[in-house]
C-alpha cells in the first residue's frame, strides 16, 4: 500500500490490518547522505505469524539435487504406488537414530562419509526424524564454531572478514547491537552502503557511514551489520559472488550470535538500495523482509517477493536514472500482485515529496514495518523466478544446475491434499523437499501439475536428507527429511 505523502516529519506507515497505524520511529540527527545508485502508502497484508508452520531456526551453499531413481535419501517411489507408504518400523528407526548418535561421537576427522552409512538411508519415524535433526544441527553448529572463529566478533569500530573457499571475493563487515536479545534470538539487519563506481576510499567512507546509521534507523533488539561491498563498481552488491558470502555471514551469526533465522532483514541506501532490488527476490528464502531506499531496480523482477515484505522509499526529486519513477512503478506493480494473490506481496512504498536523493531519514519508517514481519520458511505458496545469477534452492523447492536458466519460473503450493504446481517455465527436473510441518509424511504424497497427477507415492524420512539440507543451507528451518524428485513434461 502506498504511504501518504510526507510533510515535515516522516508519516506513519498506514496499515490495512485491523485499521491500526504503525508509529514511525523518531529519527535522530541525520548522518551524511550516502552516494549512489510525491506520493505515498503501505500495502500491509496480515503479517506471517512467527514460526508459522516452521520447525525452528538460516544457511549457505550450493545444492545438488539427486536424479529420480538414484537411490538418494527421501526419494519418492515411482508414480502409481498410490495407497502404499514408506512408514518406518519403530525398531529400524530407533536403530538408525542410535547409529547416528554413535557416529557423531567419533572424532570428526575419522568419520566416514555419513551419506554412505547404512543408517543414513533407513526410514525414520516422525519423532526420530526430529531427534536426528536436532543432533545433526548441534553437530553442524559445533563445526562452525570450531572452524570460523576468525569470521565473527566484529564491532562498530573493528571489522571482520569472511572468505569462502572457491570464491575470489571477500566480505568485510562492521556490527552494532541494539537492545537485548529476545528468547528466540536477535533480529538481524544486513544494511548495504551507497557509493558504487567510485574510488575505494569513497566506498570505504560510505561503508563507515552505514554502521553509524543504526542510531537513526534504530532497529529494536537487533544486530545491525554493515558489509563492505566486495568491489568498487555500480553492481557492487549484486555480483554473483555476493550470495555465497551473505549466506555464510547469516549462518555465522545464527551460530555465534544467536540470530533468529526467521528475523533476518536486508536493507540498503542508494547503490545499496540497488542491491536490495536484486537480492530481495533472488535470495528471498533468507529474508523476513527487505527495505530499499534511493536505489534503482535495473532489470530485476518482483515475482519472487511473494513471501518477502518489501519496502520502497525514494525522494520525489531523485530524478537521476528515473529512480523516483521506477520506485512508483515497482510500488504499483507490488500492489497489483498483492491484489491478484491475497496474502502475498506485502509492501510499503513512498515517493517522498520534495526530497532529493537524501531523504533526511524519512525512509526510517521502513524499519518498524519490516520488523513487524517474521519469515515463514515453509510458506504454503511460492513463486520462484530465476534471476541473472540463479540459485539452487528456494524455500522447499530445488533445481539442479541444468534447470536454473535465467527466467525459469515455478509457481507451486501445498495443502493437506498434496503439492500443486500451477506454472512451470524452462524447468524439466525439480525436487520438492518435505517436512512433517508441511504434510503428513506417513501417507502417500500426491503431486500434480495443472491438475494432472504426476505422482502419488510414499516418501521416506532419512538422516541423509536431513544432513544434506543442513550442510547446504545451515538453517534448521530448512532441514527437510524427505524429497520428491520430479521429471516434468
Regions found by a protein language model. Name each.
Residues 1-86:
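Ser/Thr-rich, Pro/Gly/Ala-heavy low-complexity intrinsically disordered linkers and tails
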Residues 27, 36, 55, 68, ...:
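A domain-start/cap signature at the N-terminus of enzymes
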Residues 179-184, 234-271, 282-286:
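Gly/Ser-rich "nucleophile elbow"/oxyanion-hole loop immediately N-terminal to the catalytic nucleophile
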Residues 311-315:
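Short beta-strand/loop motif that positions the catalytic acidic residue
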Residues 319, 325-327, 331, 335-420, ...:
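C-terminal catalytic histidine-bearing segment of alpha/beta-hydrolase fold enzymes
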Amino acid at each position: 500500500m502506498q504511504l501518504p505523502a510526507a510533510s515535515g516529519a516522516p508519516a506513519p506507515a498506514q496499515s490495512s490490518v485491523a485499521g491500526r497505524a504503525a508509529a514511525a520511529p523518531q529519527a535522530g540527527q541525520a548522518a551524511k547522505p550516502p552516494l549512489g545508485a510525491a506520493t505515498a502508502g503501505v500495502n500491509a497484508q496480515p503479517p506471517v505469524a512467527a514460526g508459522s508452520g516452521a520447525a525452528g531456526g538460516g544457511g549457505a551453499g550450493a545444492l545438488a539435487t539427486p536424479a529420480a531413481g538414484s537411490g538418494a535419501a527421501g526419494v519418492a517411489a515411482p508414480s502409481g504406488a498410490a495407497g502404499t507408504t514408506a512408514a518406518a518400523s519403530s525398531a529400524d528407526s530407533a536403530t538408525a537414530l542410535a547409529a547416528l548418535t554413535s557416529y557423531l561421537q567419533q572424532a570428526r576427522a575419522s568419520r566416514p562419509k555419513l551419506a554412505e552409512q547404512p543408517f543414513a538411508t533407513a526410514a525414520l519415524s516422525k519423532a526420530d526424524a526430529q531427534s536426528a535433526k536436532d543432533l545433526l544441527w548441534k553437530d553442524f553448529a559445533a563445526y562452525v564454531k570450531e572452524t570460523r572463529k576468525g569470521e565473527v566478533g566484529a564491532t562498530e569500530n573493528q571489522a571482520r572478514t569472511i572468505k569462502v573457499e572457491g570464491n575470489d571475493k571477500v566480505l568485510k563487515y562492521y556490527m552494532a547491537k541494539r537492545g537485548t536479545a529476545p528468547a528466540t534470538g536477535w533480529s538481524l539487519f544486513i544494511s548495504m552502503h551507497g557509493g558504487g563506481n567510485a574510488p575505494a576510499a569513497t566506498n570505504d567512507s560510505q561503508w563507515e557511514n552505514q554502521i553509524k546509521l543504526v542510531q537513526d534507523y534504530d532497529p529494536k533488539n537487533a544486530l545491525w551489520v554493515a558489509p563492505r561491498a566486495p568491489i568498487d563498481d555500480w553492481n557492487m552488491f549484486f555480483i554473483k559472488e555476493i550470495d555465497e558470502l551473505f549466506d555464510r555471514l547469516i549462518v555465522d551469526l545464527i551460530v555465534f550470535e544467536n540470530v533468529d533465522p526467521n528475523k533476518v532483514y536486508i536493507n540498503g541506501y542508494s547503490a545499496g538500495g540497488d542491491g536490495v532490488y536484486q537480492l530481495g527476490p533472488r535470495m528471498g528464502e533468507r529474508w523476513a523482509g527487505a527495505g530499499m531506499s534511493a536505489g534503482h531496480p535495473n532489470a530485476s523482477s518482483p515475482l519472487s517477493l511473494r513471501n518477502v515484505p518489501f519496502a520502497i522509499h525514494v525522494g520525489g526529486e531523485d530524478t537521476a536514472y528515473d529512480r523516483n519513477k521506477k520506485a512508483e512503478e515497482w510500488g504499483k506493480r507490488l500492489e497489483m500482485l498483492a491484489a491478484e494473490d491475497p496474502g502475498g506481496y506485502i509492501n510499503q512504498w513512498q515517493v517522498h515529496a520534495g526530497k532529493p536523493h537524501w531523504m533526511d531519514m524519512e525512509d526510517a519508517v521502513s524499519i518498524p514495518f519490516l520488523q513487524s514481519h517474521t519469515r515463514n520458511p515453509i510458506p504454503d505458496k511460492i513463486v520462484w523466478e530465476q534471476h541473472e545469477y540463479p540459485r539452487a534452492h528456494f524455500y522447499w523447492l530445488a533445481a539442479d544446475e541444468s534447470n536454473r536458466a535465467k527466467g525459469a519460473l515455478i509457481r507451486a503450493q501445498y495443502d493437506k491434499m498434496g503439492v500443486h504446481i500451477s506454472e512451470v517455465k524452462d524447468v524439466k527436473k525439480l525436487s520438492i523437499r518435505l517436512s512433517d510441518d508441511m504434510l503428513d509424511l506417513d501417507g502417500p504424497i500426491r503431486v500434480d501439475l495443472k491438475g494432472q497427477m504426476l505422482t502419488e507415492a510414499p516418501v521416506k524420512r532419512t538422516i541423509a536428507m536431513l544432513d544434506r539440507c543442513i550442510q547446504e543451507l545451515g538453517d534448521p528451518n530448512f532441514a527437510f527429511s524427505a524429497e520428491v524428485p520430479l521429471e516434468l513434461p
